[in-house]
Each structure stands twice: as structure tokens, then as C-alpha cells.
Amino acid sequence: MILRPIRPEDEPLEREMFTTFSERTQRFRFFQLIGDITHDMLIRYTQIDYDREIAIIAEHTDSEEKKRMLGVVRLISDPYNETAEFAIVVGDPWHGQGLGSIFADMILDIARERGITKITAHVLKDNFIMKHIFEKRGFTIKGDEDMWYAELDL
């Protein structure tokens, strides 16, 4: 497995990864069910402005040389690169293998290198895996009846 920035030519890998998402994974990442991912969405997710956003993918090449995207972490900053929001999604076949934690640690390091001073994230209240990731890294977590709001000063 390699971790690397996403590229425009990763659109087919992103589309294929999306097909591995259960309804639960879709709801946790997008706060709704998407159905089929559109070409416009794929463009938005693979052709990014690296001055304000970064997306790191986990790519695996199997024994038959087929590449797969296992997951992606995104960091989107404000125009001043002071505060940024991050999100993680991992394809269902690769849940429970520590990839979310690897992504979280990596994106926090990248945020620090960029001089970002605050990281935020919003997740649904039943996304206990992400809540655990936040707690383990020292995020302040607040909630309402539907969402967890996490913040970390870097």
C-alpha cells in the first residue's frame, strides 16, 4: 500500500472505491445516501486546488497488478490557511485495519506543516469509530442530537 496525493487520473479508482461503500459508509461520509456517484462529483474529488485542499489516497496494487483505492483523507482549509476541516472515508472491505488512524495522523502532520492552527470535523452521532479517532488525538468534542463537532488546536 502507498499513500499519495490524489490526481485527476484517479477518477476511475475513486469511482470503483465508491462502489464498495455500504449505505452506512455513505451516510457517515456524505450525511446522506448518494446512489451513483456522478462524473461532476468525481471531478470535484479528483481535481483539487492544492493551495487550499489536499487529498491523500491509500492505493494498493494486487497480485494481478490491478490498482485499487482503499480510502481517502481530505483537508480543506479556509482562504488564509488558518483553519481546516478534514474528512476520512475507507472502503468497506478495508474497514478495521487501522487505515482511518493512519490517515488521521498523516493529515494532522500535513496541517501542522502548512501552518494550520485549528482542525475541525463533523460526524454523525453514531459514527463511534471517528469519535474514537478524535478522542485519541486530543480533539475537543461537542455534540447535539445528530452530530459530533470536533476541534483540535495545533
Regions of interest found by a model, annotated:
Residues 1-154:
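Long, contiguous binding/interaction regions
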